A protein has these predicted regions:
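A short, charged, amphipathic alpha-helix used as a generic interaction element across diverse proteins
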Residues: 26-47
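Short, mixed-charge low-complexity intrinsically disordered segments
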Residues: 41-77
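Hydrophobic residues positioned within well-ordered beta-strands of beta-sheet architectures
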Residues: 4-6, 19-21, 68
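Short intrinsically disordered coil segments
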Residues: 21-22, 37-40, 69
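A short, exposed loop/beta-hairpin motif centered on an aromatic-Gly-Thr core
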Residues: 16-28
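Short aromatic-glycine-(Arg/Gly/Cys) micro-motifs in beta-strand/loop hairpins
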Residues: 1-16
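A structural detector for beta-sheet-dominated domains
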Residues: 9, 24-26, 51, 73
Length: 77
C-alpha cells in the first residue's frame, strides 16, 4: 500500500481554492478512483485540475499529474 496526497483545484470554484485529498491504496489509478468517489457521481471529473501529487512522501511531478489525468479521463461523461 502507498500513501497518496492529491492537491487539486475545482475549475468551477470561483475562489480557486486548492483542496487536499489523502488516501492509502495500491496505485495512483486507485487513488484517483477514490477521489472520484469522494467527489460524488454528480460531479464532472473534467473540472478537476491537479496541482500536486505526492506518493509516499515524494512529489511525483508532472508525469504523475499526467498519469492521474489519464486515470481521471475514464470518468468523463
Amino acid at each position: 500500500m502507498k500513501n497518496y496526497m492529491i492537491k487539486y483545484i475545482l475549475a468551477d470554484d470561483e475562489q480557486q481554492k486548492e483542496i487536499e485529498f489523502s488516501v492509502q491504496c495500491e496505485s495512483l489509478d486507485k487513488a484517483v478512483e477514490a477521489l472520484v468517489a469522494e467527489l460524488g457521481k454528480n460531479y464532472n471529473p473534467a473540472n478537476v485540475d491537479f496541482t500536486t501529487i505526492v506518493e509516499d512522501g515524494n512529489d511525483i511531478g508532472e508525469d504523475g499529474i499526467y498519469d492521474a489525468e489519464i486515470s481521471l479521463a475514464k470518468y468523463y461523461n
